[in-house]
């Protein structure tokens, strides 16, 4: 009772302080002695006085915000510890709806006004090249350019180089795909190991030779198989600059579908490996093969301390435009950056491909003659019918003149007299003969050039960084700085076309089953990293490290590398051969199973009340997994908890850094179930049947759904007992609409069930925030009405089907070449609809032949109840050349603008361009897409990367799956015929703009609201339910685990807490990498009564007091991938992040 009084008093105190503070503010502004009334005339001095008053008012608001924040923390502390009365139970009203009483705990939504300034933008200079504007202004015509088909004729004056020689760097390279036509291991065995073995011997033959490598995954495998002498030689070659490892990631990742967690993780894995084994730190980025480029990647490379980068696969019309305006080299800047802290120097290759015919100059017929692997007698030749000729004394002058002409023409497209000429292709240099042919012939050409000053050319072999260093030197700037006159660019390079209207927008969806599995593995990896790091730190602090399975670190390392491998631009993209896809799938599943073990082991240790009782037994795990997959291409099957006379315990893991109020659904073997909290309080639950089809329930399996509050990054405990509590075990009611179909229906005495043979009337589901209408005919969503609004918002959902062209060029794994607009999906039979209603959730499932569409509405306060949970179970294995799309039609006046995320890191505005074909207007959607007008925003959140567009105002359209019977002539040699039953998961969030908050139309940036960010996190990081194994008696106690002393500010995301490897072997060190991301957010969307706790702190976090029961004994800010310390370690553990920034810290917990 005493605690309850304290809570009441503190709650009242907040109100009083707020009112009193506002009174003081107004009072101080009103009675200012310097203020005079001027009858409406405001001289300049008065305006400045007014500005001062406004600034003072802002300062006072800020102070007020801080006071309330402090009081809020006190109240939350009190309420968290309060053993209040049991919560009121849900009840059923006369009008047929469930009411869940409000929670006794207060919720806070307290955002500092200063934190709202960032999204308003308007600071800093605009870049010369904004890609959204470039795309709007370009004609995208495809005029024949002569020998450079997609470009133009290039001419020059031979005297252009009289004042300054042309400096040419020829960069030998071999592009090794970690899986595409062959599996990773097969490529390694048959080609890659031979390339790297030859590299060591051939580079040592002549110190003038150079070689560029990118994929650390292959390099690490090779390293494990070579002897000490060869390793020493490799270190020497790296040390003297003959061998450069560019980018240094585990793979060269896809930039469309990959999530930024995985992009960073594979970069860290590569960089850490290079530092440990070679002492190498990458300086330049090399991305010749990803199919379009995200602006997230330059940000990550810059924060990893790289100074330059190169890209290749950009739309041919953009390449031509940039070549014509000498803009192929630019400083790439983030759209939100108000100065130049995110700038990185970027080189865009000008021609069609990264192969030799398209890299020496504009004429592939001539360049092919200088690819000496194609000398007569070899296995490949020149398609232009003029073969290369070996360079001799007799022909060197003529051959050199021909090549120099190409070099000079290519250099006319750039601003400096330093020229980059890559020399390589896929899996090149795999035989010693090729090394000899290329290096000997080119060296003869270089010797000829360099011995004739009248030619004004200096040519040599080089690495990528050799080229960039020479360019910086020529332009007189420090490495990475902006050379005078070079443009600044912001935006991204999607979508990509390599010729005609062949847009590479199909791979945004291709093989969605594995795109989904990728994200499941990612969420498990992050969860396992965090729990493992916390468990190891707590075990060390308690002196129990010897008992804890620290060897799980090898499982973590393998999973990091599996996730990294799958970010490769032929893996997550869905563009590999079927056997290679199976290989990836098997790897993904193996790592997923291993990560579940890591999570179980860590949760077991952390949830024990008495750590001394901890005993690790791999043969008899303390916890069970939440679900299992029978094979890599099967959907998960949830664990059924067997109830009997003794209670069963379940440990719940919340991977979010925010406290979470969520619905947890468990499967049990009886409808007679009681659920108790950790303290033994009985909880209200909703019990439902578990369905195997539209009308058939699984016998002896029931779903029990219970709302639970879980600590940030923490563990909660539930107890399940056999028995019935009529007040708290609340059954769902079910209606099944058969639409005239003759089907048998499972019935159960525990659940009221009504069968409706032919009803077609629309019906609604509702919760405390909204009423949602569905079509009685289709079972699909029709409209949403928020409870505080009179009018409903049209949100009309449809299923559509795309065909492919009848002409020669058809859609395939890469390309989307539809036969026109999509047509409505016409089912053979009307759908069966199953409507479930209950106290905590209601849902509608529409069963069609090719898609089961479920929409669920949670009747909970906070994030869970503010959006619709949507899942689409898709099976198109009987389709021929068709693609299935989900279409949402609204009356939002979006004016041709829509927004898609880039890698889950940032949002990029898009404009529907009528001048381009339909397929050009599709973009990647890794986590969200939205449309908006002055009043509303509708966001579709996704748990897997898919392709999205808005083809008309007020519409969003997502491609769910594609089945294509033919190759699209990009080297794969297969169609997409290995479709799986795939579950795509979404959240649909409707938000209203607050009065007076403008939509930032003219801006090149846009930001989700805080609610939207949290909704995405809930979808992508679900709570895990881990039952305590039956044979394990929990003994004296399982206790919830609260790792954080206080929640992080709600604009902060703890991206990872990653245990670092020890120097000597595969064991963990005592250090972890803490990676934080401060998100940019839009304050202009409704933020009242949201029912969840959220405060911001102007970017400040006290890391020293963040972890409960652990001290931060060492803290070192570093570059993104930990290769560079950014400041000396200090005693202060307070850190500050600007919005949108990601920061990495090396820390030791003890």
Swiss-Prot record:
Show the stretches that span the lipid bilayer: 6-26
Relate the assembly described in the record: Homodimer; disulfide-linked. Interacts with MGAT4D.
Q: Which residues lie on this side of the membrane: Lumenal?
A: 27-796
Per the record's keyword annotation, is Membrane included, yes or no? Answer: yes
The terms describing its cellular component in GO are:
Golgi membrane
Membrane topology for this entry?
Answer: Single-pass type II membrane protein
Q: InterPro entries given for it?
A: Gal_mutarotase_sf_dom, Glyco_hydro/deAcase_b/a-brl, Glyco_hydro_38_C, Glyco_hydro_38_cen, Glyco_hydro_38_cen_sf, Glyco_hydro_38_N, Glyco_hydro_38_N_sf, Glyco_hydro_57/38_cen_sf
- SUPFAM superfamilies (alphabetical): Families 57/38 glycoside transferase middle domain (SSF88688), Galactose mutarotase-like (SSF74650), Glycoside hydrolase/deacetylase (SSF88713)
The protein's name is: Alpha-mannosidase 2x
Q: In terms of domain of life, where is this protein from?
A: Eukaryota
Q: Which cofactor does it need?
A: Zn(2+)
Q: Which residues are glycosylated?
A: 95, 305, 1093, 1131
**Catalysed transformations (reactions):** N(4)-{beta-D-GlcNAc-(1->2)-alpha-D-Man-(1->3)-[alpha-D-Man-(1->3)-[alpha-D-Man-(1->6)]-alpha-D-Man-(1->6)]-beta-D-Man-(1->4)-beta-D-GlcNAc-(1->4)-beta-D-GlcNAc}-L-asparaginyl-[protein] + 2 H2O = 2 alpha-D-mannopyranose + an N(4)-{beta-D-GlcNAc-(1->2)-alpha-D-Man-(1->3)-[alpha-D-Man-(1->6)]-beta-D-Man-(1->4)-beta-D-GlcNAc-(1->4)-beta-D-GlcNAc}-L-asparaginyl-[protein]
Q: Which organism is it from?
A: Homo sapiens (Human)
Q: Name one process (GO BP) from the record.
A: mannose metabolic process
Enumerate the GO terms in the molecular function aspect: alpha-mannosidase activity; carbohydrate binding; hydrolase activity, hydrolyzing N-glycosyl compounds; mannosyl-oligosaccharide 1,3-1,6-alpha-mannosidase activity; metal ion binding
Q: In which pathway does it act?
A: Protein modification; protein glycosylation
Identify its protein family: Belongs to the glycosyl hydrolase 38 family.
Keyword terms, alphabetized: Disulfide bond, Glycoprotein, Glycosidase, Golgi apparatus, Hydrolase, Membrane, Metal-binding, Signal-anchor, Transmembrane, Transmembrane helix, Zinc
Q: Which residues form the active site?
A: 289
Extract the Pfam families matched here.
Alpha-mann_mid, Glyco_hydro_38C, Glyco_hydro_38N
- Cytoplasmic-side stretches of the chain, per the record, are 1-5
């Amino acid at each position: 009772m005493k605690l309850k009084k304290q809570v009441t008093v503190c709650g009242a105190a907040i109100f009083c302080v707020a009112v009193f503070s506002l009174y003081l503010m107004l009072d101080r502004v009103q009675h200012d002695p310097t203020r005079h009334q001027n009858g409406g005339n405001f001289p300049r001095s008065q305006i400045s006085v007014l500005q001062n008053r406004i600034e003072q008012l802002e300062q006072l608001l800020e102070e007020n915000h801080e006071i309330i924040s402090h009081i809020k923390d006190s109240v939350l502390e009190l309420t968290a510890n309060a053993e209040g009365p049991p919560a009121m139970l849900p009840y059923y009203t006369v009008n047929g709806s469930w009411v869940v009483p409000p929670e006794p705990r207060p919720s806070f939504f307290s955002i500092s006004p200063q934190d709202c300034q960032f999204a308003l933008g308007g600071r800093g200079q605009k870049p010369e090249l904004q890609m959204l504007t470039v795309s709007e202004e370009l004609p995208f015509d495809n005029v024949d350019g002569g020998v450079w088909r997609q470009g133009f004729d290039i001419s020059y004056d031979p005297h252009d180089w009289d004042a300054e020689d042309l400096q040419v760097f020829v960069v030998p390279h071999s592009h090794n795909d970690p899986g595409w036509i062959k599996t990773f291991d097969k490529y390694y065995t048959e080609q890659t190991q031979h390339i790297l073995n030859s590299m060591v011997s051939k580079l040592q033959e002549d110190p003038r030779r150079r070689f560029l490598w990118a994929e650390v995954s292959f390099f690490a495998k090779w390293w494990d198989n070579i002897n000490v002498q060869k390793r020493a030689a490799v270190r020497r070659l790296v040390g003297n600059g003959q061998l450069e490892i560019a980018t240094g990631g585990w793979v060269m990742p896809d930039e469309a579908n990959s999530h930024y967690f995985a992009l960073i993780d594979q970069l860290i894995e590569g960089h850490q490996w290079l530092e440990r084994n070679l002492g190498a730190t990458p300086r330049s980025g090399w991305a010749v093969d990803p199919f379009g480029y995200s602006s997230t990647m330059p940000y990550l490379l810059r924060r990893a301390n790289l100074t330059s980068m190169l890209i290749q696969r950009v739309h041919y019309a953009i390449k031509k435009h940039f070549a014509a305006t000498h803009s192929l080299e630019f400083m790439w800047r983030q759209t939100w950056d108000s100065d130049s802290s995110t700038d990185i120097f970027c080189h865009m290759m000008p021609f069609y491909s990264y192969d030799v015919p398209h890299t020496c100059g504009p004429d592939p017929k001539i360049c092919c003659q200088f690819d000496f692997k194609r000398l007569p007698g070899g296995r490949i030749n020149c398609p232009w019918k003029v073969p290369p000729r070996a360079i001799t004394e007799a022909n060197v002058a003529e051959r050199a003149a021909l090549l120099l002409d190409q070099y000079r023409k290519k250099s006319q497209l750039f601003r400096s007299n330093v020229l980059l000429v890559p020399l390589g292709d896929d899996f090149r240099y795999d035989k010693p003969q090729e090394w000899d042919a290329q290096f000997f012939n080119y060296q003869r050409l270089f010797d000829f050039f360099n011995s004739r000053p009248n030619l004004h050319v200096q040519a040599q072999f080089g690495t990528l960084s050799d080229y960039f260093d020479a360019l910086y030197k020529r332009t007189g700037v420090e490495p990475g700085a902006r050379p005078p006159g070079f443009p600044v660019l912001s935006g991204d390079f999607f979508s990509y076309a390599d010729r005609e209207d062949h847009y590479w927008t199909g791979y945004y969806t291709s093989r969605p089953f594995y795109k989904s599995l990728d994200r499941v593995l990612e969420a498990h990896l992050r969860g396992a990293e965090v729990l493992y790091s916390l468990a190891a730190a707590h075990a060390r602090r308690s002196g129990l490290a010897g008992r804890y399975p620290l060897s799980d670190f090898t499982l973590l390392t393998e999973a990091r590398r599996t996730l990294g491998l799958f970010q490769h631009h032929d893996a997550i993209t869905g563009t590999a051969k079927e056997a290679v896809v199976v290989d990836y799938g098997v790897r993904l599943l193996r790592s997923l199973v291993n990560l579940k073990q890591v999570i179980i082991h860590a949760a077991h240790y952390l949830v024990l009340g008495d750590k001394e009782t901890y005993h690790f037994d791999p043969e008899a795990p303390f916890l069970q997994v939440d679900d299992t997959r029978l094979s890599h291409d099967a959907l998960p099957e949830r664990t059924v908890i067997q109830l009997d006379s003794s209670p069963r315990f379940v440990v719940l893991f919340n991977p979010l850094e925010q406290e979470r109020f969520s619905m947890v659904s468990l499967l049990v073997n009886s409808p007679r179930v009681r659920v108790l909290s950790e303290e033994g309080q009985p909880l209200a639950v909703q019990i439902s049947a578990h369905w195997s089809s539209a009308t058939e329930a699984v016998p002896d399996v029931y779903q029990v759904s219970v709302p639970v509050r879980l600590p940030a990054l923490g563990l909660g405990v539930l107890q399940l007992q056999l028995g019935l509590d009529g007040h708290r075990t609340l059954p769902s009611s079910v209606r099944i609409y058969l639409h005239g179909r003759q089907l048998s229906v499972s019935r159960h005495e525990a659940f009221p069930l009504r069968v409706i043979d032919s009803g077609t009337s629309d019906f609604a589901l509702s919760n405390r925030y909204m009423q949602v209408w569905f079509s009685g005919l289709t079972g699909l969503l029709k409209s949403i009405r928020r409870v505080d609004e009179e009018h409903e918002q049209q949100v009309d959902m449809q299923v559509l089907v795309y065909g492919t062209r009848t002409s020669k060029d058809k859609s395939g794994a890469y390309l989307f070449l539809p036969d026109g607009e999509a047509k409505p999906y016409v089912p053979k039979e009307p759908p069966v609809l199953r409507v479930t209603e209950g106290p905590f959730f209601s849902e509608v499932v529409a069963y069609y032949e090719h898609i089961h569409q479920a929409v669920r509405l949670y009747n909970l306060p906070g994030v869970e109840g503010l959006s619709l949970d949507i899942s689409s179970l898709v099976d198109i294995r009987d389709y021929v050349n068709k693609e299935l799309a989900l279409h949402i039609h609204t009356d939002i006046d979006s004016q041709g603008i829509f927004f898609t995320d880039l890698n889950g890191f940032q949002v990029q505005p898009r404009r529907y361009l009528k001048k381009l074909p339909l397929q050009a207007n599709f973009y990647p959607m890794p986590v969200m897409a939205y449309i908006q007008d002055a009043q509303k925003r509708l966001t579709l959140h996704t748990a897997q990367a898919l392709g999205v567009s808005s083809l008309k105002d007020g519409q969003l359209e997502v491609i769910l799956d594609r089945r294509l019977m033919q190759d699209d002539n990009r080297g794969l040699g297969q169609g997409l015929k290995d479709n799986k039953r795939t579950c795509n998961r979404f959240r649909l969030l409707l938000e209203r703009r607050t009065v007076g908050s403008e939509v930032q139309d003219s801006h090149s940036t846009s930001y989700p609201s805080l609610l939207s960010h949290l909704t995405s996190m809930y979808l992508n990081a679900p709570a895990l339910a881990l039952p305590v194994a039956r044979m394990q008696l929990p003994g004296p106690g399982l206790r919830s685990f609260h790792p954080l002393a206080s929640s992080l500010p709600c604009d902060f995301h703890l991206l990872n807490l990653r245990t670092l490897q020890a120097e000597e072997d595969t064991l963990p060190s005592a250090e972890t990498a803490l990676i934080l991301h401060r998100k940019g957010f839009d304050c202009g969307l409704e933020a009242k009564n949201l029912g969840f706790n959220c405060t911001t702190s102007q970017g400040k976090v006290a890391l020293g007091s963040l972890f409960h029961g652990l001290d931060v004994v060492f803290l070192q800010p570093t570059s993104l991938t930990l290769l560079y310390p950014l400041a000396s370690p200090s005693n202060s553990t307070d850190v500050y992040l600007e919005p949108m920034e990601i920061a990495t810290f090396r820390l030791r917990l003890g």
